[in-house]
């Protein structure tokens, strides 16, 4: 004999969660280092951002494409400005503590050292390209950008020094 077919029942369990529950920003998961900006390296990073912004906006507001050397200055200024903003966010949010696989002291030393060398070359190129005879309309902007480029170079030199001290103390341990 054939067995009678039973009715099958399906149980469906549904759960719901909101985006905010999964990615809450409680104080334990989101770190913010307010004191970093009060340190000398923090102050130098902010100065690099402000002065670097002045360098490339003063040049970008002119007809810089007529002088090929300003292309190099623009590249260095914009490239390191973006990366410095990126590093400031990493330091303020303490992201470096959540990614311990990255040797942050070495990365900081390489970044600041390369920024110092390339910004120094860009500042020298900027200063040597400024001439009132070449384009008197843009002379003041280019001269000011040259001045600020040297100030940014000094800031990167300072941060290179602090990065070297941190790197050296880290490698000695």
Swiss-Prot record:
Residues 36-168 form the MARVEL domain. PROSITE patterns: MARVEL. Signal peptide: none annotated. The chain crosses the membrane at residues 40-60, 70-90, 105-125, 147-167. Keywords: Chemotaxis, Cytokine, Cytoplasm, Membrane, Nucleus, Transmembrane, Transmembrane helix. It holds the Pfam family MARVEL. One of its GO terms (cellular component) is nucleoplasm. Highly expressed in liver and pancreas. GO terms for biological process: chemotaxis; myelination. The keyword Cytoplasm applies. GO terms for molecular function: cytokine activity; structural constituent of myelin sheath. Belongs to the chemokine-like factor family. This is CKLF-like MARVEL transmembrane domain-containing protein 8.
């Amino acid at each position: 004999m054939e067995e009678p077919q039973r009715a099958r029942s399906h149980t469906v369990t549904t759960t719901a969660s909101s985006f905010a529950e999964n990615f809450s920003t409680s104080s334990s998961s989101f770190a913010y280092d307010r004191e970093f900006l009060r340190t000398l390296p923090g102050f130098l990073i902010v100065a690099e951002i402000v002065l670097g912004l002045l360098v490339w906006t003063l040049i970008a507001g002119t007809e810089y494409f007529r002088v090929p050397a300003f292309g190099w200055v623009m590249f260095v200024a914009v490239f390191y400005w973006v990366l410095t903003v990126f590093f400031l966010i990493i330091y303020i949010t303490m992201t470096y503590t959540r990614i311990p696989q990255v040797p942050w002291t070495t990365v900081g030393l390489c970044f600041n050292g390369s920024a110092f060398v390339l910004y120094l070359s860009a500042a020298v190129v900027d200063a040597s390209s400024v001439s009132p005879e070449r384009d008197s309309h843009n002379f003041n902007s280019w001269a000011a950008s040259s001045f600020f480029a040297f100030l940014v170079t000094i800031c990167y030199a300072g941060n290179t020094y602090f990065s070297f001290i941190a790197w050296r103390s880290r490698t000695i341990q």
